[in-house]
UniProtKB/Swiss-Prot annotation:
Name of the protein this chain belongs to: Heat shock protein 67B1
Compositional bias per record (Polar residues), positions renumbered to this chain: 306-315
Molecular function GO terms recorded: unfolded protein binding
GO CC entries: cytoplasm; nucleus
SUPFAM superfamilies: HSP20-like chaperones
Organism of provenance: Drosophila melanogaster
Any single GO BP term: protein refolding
Region of interest (Disordered), residue spans: 222-284, 296-408
Similarity section: Belongs to the small heat shock protein (HSP20) family.
Annotated PROSITE patterns: SHSP
Length: 445
């Protein structure tokens, strides 16, 4: 058997031992203290062949990587394992250190040590959580449910000797098992400081106990006639039927037009024969809005009666209609006179009279100032003769002036309407007087 492997192992162990001694002397942390990762590890000089680096009196083969980073001098004396629990002292110390660290952090943050005794149980009696909270008063504890989660919270502040404040606070969360109702959760606090949170178990669901809802559906027999009726389109509603019936009735029996009060028109017109037309009564037919020509003609007929009832500036009789209507009717009358004579849809005038009298539509209105009556008398006394063209031209000029005046009246306000009306009547009287003078001169010739 060769001694070479044994000699190599011994040399390696001696090298490790010498290095460990140097670390023990030069370590500033002191002997017996175990700082974790306090000093940088020297590079591994061993050739390793699968064995760990043991800095101990007795080398331990197969040591874990976590223990290789710690320097523990007690392993030189105590050995690798203990006889009682078959664990190395390093592992035991590590476990104790973890417990001490957790305990220190718990005391620092104010976590009560007794709260670690809380436990939860799920059995046939339901879900139950118990915890020792004797360091908390009842008003310092809060139990609430968020969806299917139970949250237990405690907050305690205590002042000691006026120098410091001890604060304890904890939060515990528990998930309810599936099927438990959060609304059924209730909690109790005993006199010895045990808080119990309970939730009753859900009702057992037995598959056989489920009641089935059964209903027998009747089979109705449908005849062929009902089938044909169902195939027909739906009938209109009663409202539509009534509307159709009323429309049919109105079509068969058209309603007569409502008679309007007749307007007595006194037209003192002198035709070519010098005869005076008598009064005639006719119903005032309102022209359709869409037909502009008929509307203009109807307004031309209604204008004399309206102007006849209009009060002049001489007698001061109250006006029956609005001033705006007067202006509109006067404008329509003058426009109809300027344009070519249009047939009146209400009054049927013979074409022969139109041919004889070129100024048939120029109807002087018998106003209340008395001038119209004199003109009518003079027309009766005159012999049969045609009117000269001079009067026609003068009348056209007067009509153009009247149209201009009416347009100006529309632009003016309502305060000047009475004065403008008087001016229009005066212009009409002057036109009548001019026509009479022209006739007199013709007769004198």
């Amino acid at each position: 058997m060769s001694l070479i492997p044994f000699i190599l192992d011994l040399a390696e162990e001696l090298h490790d031992f010498n290095r460990s001694l140097a670390m023990d002397i030069d370590d500033s942390a002191g002997f017996g203290l175990y700082p974790l990762e306090a000093t940088s590890q020297l590079p591994q000089l061993s050739r390793g062949l699968g064995r760990g680096n043991a800095m101990m009196w007795v080398p331990i083969k197969g040591q874990s990587a976590a223990s290789q980073h710690r320097h523990h001098p007690y392993n030189r004396v105590a050995g690798a394992k203990t006889a009682c629990c078959n664990k190395s002292l390093v592992e035991l110390e590590k476990e104790l250190g973890d417990k001490g660290t957790s305990g220190a952090s718990g005391s620092t943050s104010g976590q009560p040590a007794a709260s670690k005794s809380a436990y939860s149980v799920v059995n046939r009696n339901g879900f139950q959580v118990s915890m020792n909270v004797k360091q908390f008063a009842a008003n310092e504890l809060t139990v609430k449910t968020i969806d299917n989660c139970i949250v237990v919270e405690g907050q305690h502040d205590e002042k000691e000797d006026g120098h410091g404040v001890i604060s304890r606070h904890f939060i515990r969360k528990y998930i309810l098992p599936k099927g438990y109702d959060p609304n059924e959760v209730h909690s109790t606090l005993s006199s010895d400081g045990i808080l119990t949170v309970k939730a009753p178990p859900p009702l057992p669901v037995v598959k056989g106990s489920l009641e089935r809802q059964e209903r027998i559906v009747d089979i109705q027999q449908i005849s062929q006639q009902q089938k044909d009726k169902d195939a027909q389109p739906p009938k209109p509603s009663e409202v539509e039927q009534q509307a159709a019936a009323s429309a049919t009735t109105s079509t068969l029996n058209p309603t007569a037009p409502t008679p309007t009060p007749s307007l007595s028109l006194t037209l003192a017109e002198s035709n070519g024969n010098g005869q005076e037309e008598t009064e005639m009564e006719m119903p005032a037919v309102s022209p359709p809005i869409s037909n502009e020509a008929a509307a203009a003609a109807a307004v031309a007929v209604e204008a004399p009666s309206t102007a006849g009832t209009t009060s002049s500036a001489n007698n001061g009789v109250a006006e029956p209609e609005s001033e705006s209507m007067e202006v509109a009717l006067a404008k329509n009358e003058e426009t109809a006179n300027v344009d070519e004579p249009t047939p009146n849809p209400v009054i049927s005038i013979e074409e022969e009279q139109k041919a004889e009298d070129a100024n048939a539509n120029e109807v002087p209105v018998a106003s209340n100032n008395g001038n119209g009556a004199v003109a009518a008398a003079e027309d009766v006394e005159m012999p049969l003769a045609k009117k000269p063209e001079i009067s026609t031209e003068d009348s056209k000029e007067e009509q153009a002036e009247k149209v201009d005046k009416v347009e100006k009246v529309e632009e003016k306000g309502g305060e000047e309407l009475a004065a403008v009306d008087a001016a229009i009547l005066l212009a009409k009287n002057q036109g009548e007087n001019g026509a009479t003078a022209a006739k007199t001169e013709e007769l004198a010739k």
